[in-house]
């Protein structure tokens, strides 16, 4: 009997385009999920594929959606909402109507339990900070809750609770996949902008970049703590990367780079030539774009049973 396979899709705002390339590489190999768990933009991408057949054509359709997205479609400026939010009369700075329309257009099932592929969404209780796995109930509201970046979008009301972005509590919910019985987990992180020449200038860009650094650190810890409980395959996000999570202008580049990297990496995994042992927080000492690729994934030959992995030094970025 085949292993139960999960796809876990992390948050990352505009860097969610990276997951489109990764998904294409997976579906090209006919690697299909038995269940999908998503957080934030990963919930949007996950809900899209959970609505449709597990085919390359589905990913082509998702790519077309992403190519049509712009910053102002997701984060539309509204001076009045921003003013009221800044002075405490609203709990958010950006109207949610555009995001709600986007979610409604891409999720083709009304309730989570009606998805073609079992689909679960992670959100955060705005009051307690606890993480919630939403497995039943209104599907579009669940995705909207998971993507409700705190302070930017309003919380989503769900069964008497105010829910915000799942990335606050658990951006890459590997543990939930294992709890649901997954034996093989494909993890689709969006990565971080590791190759910037200077910190982001805008407030929203700085917020999203800082959150990406924070959640990456949690991911490293979670992979280390769970690696013996399931087969974890972490697809490598593009690196070096100098695209901020608020930049929708380089979607095509992100999709293509992610597809190329994921396809090559899966080839190595299929041949037993690569074992992902973890990631590292890093940046690049060279100027942006100064290297073709910095690989934060230490790759070693497969380790024989009972052996200890080598801890050889990798490239320092």
Regions found by a protein language model. Give the residues of each.
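Short secondary-structure transition/capping segments
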Residues: 46-49, 124, 197-201, 279
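Catalytic domains of lipid- and phosphate-ester/thioester hydrolases
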Residues: 1-34, 45, 49-50, 59-60, ...
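Active-site-adjacent alpha/beta core region of enzyme catalytic domains
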Residues: 74-193, 225-276
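Short, hinge-like loop/turn segments at secondary-structure boundaries
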Residues: 52-54, 202-206, 252-253
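Catalytic cores of transferase enzymes with a strong primary signal for eukaryotic protein kinases
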Residues: 31-33, 129, 202
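Short, basic, helix/turn surface patches
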Residues: 61-72, 209-223
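Short acidic, glycine/proline-enriched helix-loop-strand junctions
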Residues: 194-218, 228-233
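Patatin-like phospholipase
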Residues: 2-103, 135-145, 189, 193, ...
């Amino acid at each position: 009997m085949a292993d139960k396979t999960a796809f876990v899709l992390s948050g990352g705002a505009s860097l969610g385009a990276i997951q489109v390339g990764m998904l294409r590489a997976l579906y090209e190999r006919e690697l299909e999920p038995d269940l999908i768990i998503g957080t934030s933009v990963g919930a949007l991408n996950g809900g899209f594929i959970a609505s449709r057949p597990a085919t390359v054509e589905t990913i082509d359709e998702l790519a077309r959606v992403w190519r049509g997205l712009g910053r102002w479609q997701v984060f539309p400026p509204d001076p009045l909402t921003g003013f009221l939010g800044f002075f405490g009369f609203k709990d958010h700075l950006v109207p949610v109507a555009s995001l709600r329309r986007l979610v409604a257009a891409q999720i083709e099932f009304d309730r989570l339990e009606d998805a073609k592929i079992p689909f679960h969404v992670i959100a955060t209780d705005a009051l307690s900070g606890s993480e919630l796995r939403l497995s039943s109930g209104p599907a579009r509201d669940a995705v909207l809750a998971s993507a409700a970046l705190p302070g930017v979008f309003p919380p989503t009301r769900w069964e008497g609770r105010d829910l915000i972005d799942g990335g606050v509590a658990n951006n890459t919910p590997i543990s939930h996949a294992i709890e649901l019985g997954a034996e093989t987990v494909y993890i689709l992180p969006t990565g971080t902008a590791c190759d910037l020449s200077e910190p982001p200038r805008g407030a929203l860009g700085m917020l999203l970049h800082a959150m990406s650094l924070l959640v990456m650190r949690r991911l490293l810890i979670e992979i280390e703590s769970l690696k013996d409980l399931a087969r974890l395959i972490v697809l490598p996000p593009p690196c070096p990367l100098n695209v901020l999570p608020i930049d929708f202008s380089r979607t095509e580049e992100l999709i293509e780079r992610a597809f190329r990297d994921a396809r090559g990496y899966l080839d190595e995994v299929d041949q037993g030539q690569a074992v992902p042992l973890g990631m590292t927080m890093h940046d690049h000492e060279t100027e942006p774009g100064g290297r073709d690729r910095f690989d934060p994934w230490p790759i070693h030959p497969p380790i024989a049973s009972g052996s200890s992995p080598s801890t050889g030094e990798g490239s320092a970025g």
